[in-house]
UniProtKB/Swiss-Prot annotation:
Coiled coil regions in record: none
Protein's recorded name: Small ribosomal subunit protein uS5
InterPro entries: Ribosomal_Su5_D2-typ_SF (IPR020568), Ribosomal_uS5 (IPR000851), Ribosomal_uS5_bac-type (IPR005712), Ribosomal_uS5_C (IPR005324), Ribosomal_uS5_N (IPR013810), Ribosomal_uS5_N_CS (IPR018192), Ribsml_uS5_D2-typ_fold_subgr (IPR014721)
Free-text note regarding domains: The N-terminal domain interacts with the head of the 30S subunit; the C-terminal domain interacts with the body and contacts protein S4. The interaction surface between S4 and S5 is involved in control of translational fidelity.
Keyword RNA-binding: yes
UniProt similarity note: Belongs to the universal ribosomal protein uS5 family.
Gene Ontology cellular component annotations, sorted alphabetically: small ribosomal subunit
Gene: rpsE
Length: 176
C-alpha cells in the first residue's frame, strides 16, 4: 500500500546549500555535487534533506525527495508563531527560538530563515549560538521544533482539560 500525499505540488522548496565534493581515485579526481534542501507547505509541515549526484539538478532532486520523506508537523500558535520558547542542540550548534508578537516578522539568520519560511511562521525571534555550519544549524532547529508542544497535547498528556492548563491571573497569590 503506497502513501499518497495531497498538496504535493503546493510544497515550497528552498535550496539551502550546494557543495562540490571530490573523490580522489587512481586516475585523478571525480567531482560530484551535494545539495541540502528544505521543503514545507507553509501551514505547519516542514522537512530537510540531503542529496548527492554528478549533476546539481540531480542532487537537488534527491535532496527534495529526502526532505519530503522527513517532513514533520509542527503546531503553530495562531498559525503565525510557536507556542513557547525552546532551545535546540546538535553537535556544537545551539539555537534559541522565541515566540514573538504579531508584526515582529522572522528575525533569524541563514538556514533557520529558510525553515521558518517553509513552515509558515510569520513572527519569531531565533538566535544561533556556537557553530554556524548549515547542517548542524538545521539539525539544531529541527531538534528545537521537535521539543515544541501545544497546550492541547500537554493537556492530553496530563489527563486534564485545556482550561486547567492555563493559570488565571486572579488565582496567583503574592506573598508580602
Amino acid at each position: 500500500m503506497s502513501k499518497v500525499r495531497k498538496n504535493e505540488e503546493a510544497l515550497s522548496e528552498v535550496l539551502v546549500d550546494v557543495n562540490r565534493v571530490t573523490k580522489v581515485v587512481k586516475g585523478g579526481r571525480r567531482f560530484a555535487f551535494s545539495a541540502y534542501v528544505v521543503v514545507g507547505d507553509k501551514a505547519g509541515r516542514v522537512g530537510a534533506g540531503h542529496g548527492k549526484a554528478k549533476e546539481v539538478n540531480e542532487a537537488r532532486e534527491k535532496a527534495k525527495q529526502a526532505a519530503k520523506k522527513k517532513m514533520m508537523k509542527v503546531s503553530l500558535y495562531q498559525n503565525r508563531t510557536i507556542h513557547h520558547d525552546v532551545i535546540g542542540r546538535s553537535g556544537a550548534a545551539k539555537v534559541v527560538l522565541r515566540r514573538a508578537k504579531a508584526g515582529t516578522g522572522v528575525i533569524a539568520g541563514g538556514s533557520m530563515r529558510a525553515i521558518f519560511d517553509s513552515l509558515g511562521v510569520h513572527d519569531i525571534v531565533a538566535k544561533s549560538i556556537g557553530s554556524t555550519n548549515v547542517y548542524t544549524m538545521i539539525a539544531a532547529t529541527f531538534d528545537a521544533l521537535k521539543k515544541l508542544s501545544s497546550p492541547k497535547s500537554i493537556a492530553a498528556r496530563r489527563d486534564k482539560k485545556m482550561n486547567e492548563i492555563f493559570i488565571k491571573s486572579s488565582d496567583i497569590q503574592v506573598n508580602e
